[in-house]
Swiss-Prot record:
Pfam families: EPSP_synthase. This is UDP-N-acetylglucosamine 1-carboxyvinyltransferase. One of its GO terms (cellular component) is cytoplasm. GO terms for molecular function: UDP-N-acetylglucosamine 1-carboxyvinyltransferase activity. It comes from Akkermansia muciniphila (strain ATCC BAA-835 / DSM 22959 / JCM 33894 / BCRC 81048 / CCUG 64013 / CIP 107961 / Muc). Its EC number is 2.5.1.7. The gene is murA. Keywords: Cell cycle, Cell division, Cell shape, Cell wall biogenesis/degradation, Cytoplasm, Peptidoglycan synthesis, Pyruvate, Transferase.
Amino acid sequence: MEKLVVHGGFTLRGAVNISGSKNASLPILAASLLTDEPVVVRRVPDVSDTNFMVQIMGQLGASVERSSGNVRVEARNLHSEAAYEQVRKMRASICLMGPLMARMQRCVIPLPGGCVIGDRPVDLHIRAIQALGAQVQIERGNLIIEAPRGLKGATVDLSGDHGPTVLGTDNLMMAAVLAEGTTVIESAASEPEVVDLANFLTKMGANIQGAGTRRIVIEGVEKLRGCNHTVIPDRIEAGTFMVAAAMMGDGVTLRRVCEEHMTVVTDLLRKCGHHVEFNERGDTVTIIAGKTPKCGEIKTAPYPGYPTDMQAQMTALFATTPGISVVKDTIFPQRFMHCSELKRMGADIKVDNGTAVISGVETLSGAPVMASDLRASAALVLAALKAEGTTEIHRLYHIDRGYEMIDEKLLAIGAAVERLPDDDN
């Protein structure tokens, strides 16, 4: 294992290239199994989650070549059973269900792993595939799914307790593109990553209308073809670096971003007194930390609301912002494990019933802290940049799941960080 050692207090200046979206890459890679023709996906981030997905696809029989951010997939000879050893490491592996069912009418997928941040049930995925005519059994920790007569189009409502499901929408779209007839997805997720998947599927020859709205209509086709596709920028990585710049920046420029996807984070940072300016094309943004930052309030919500994947980072910002800030997570109310570690660094945070109340303190102090999940680890890195002294962040593998070369990118803008072997874990 490795740890990240951060020496706090250094001003951040310079430029960073934002990677392609991890959350878009995973279902797009899975969707490449829908055709036996070659597919090339560009700007796939080199993070452990995409590496796991590539390994699983190879185990399923696909030929997968990876080079300099490009992934070439040719899935001529597939088999339908995914291995537990890789699937257990990544929650998003459930999105293999849709392509395998569409292509082979059968799949066996171990119930997946990933971040442990509260209940993330696969019930909606199961309900959706059953609506298309599949039979589902759970045996010895495996989902065994079969549709001997093929998948048939249907109307499926994906509404859940905490809003639309992104991976559920992805999975159902992928299953429906080769199904017989028309599939209508009600209460669909409208995140940019869902739209990117729909654009990729459309390039392959799928007939999809309404992606980006709450109602998606898919007319099944007989066959999909190969294509080339470039993944959208990672809005969560961009947001994380925007917050880092708001905490310690004196002119940090982020390239390869999408202004349209960053609206809610941009508006919040400006409201809290920080300077955020995009270029005319909306693909480059410069952030300068405000001299008189203000406290704020956020409530997570499905897109275009404030993303749950950005609440931990904003909590780190609020920890040293004067006044009382409030963070409420309506999507994953248990997603506050980072707060206990921030408190070890001197933060004043009270968490109750899915809400964190943060009283800003003047300074944080470096301390040994433990990452508990992907975005929590990002929050700890941000806090460490601001803290006085040295912080050691253990279980660095969490952050490597979703941030490409974060230590190198931070070094490029003036942070004092080093990745070291973790002898304590």
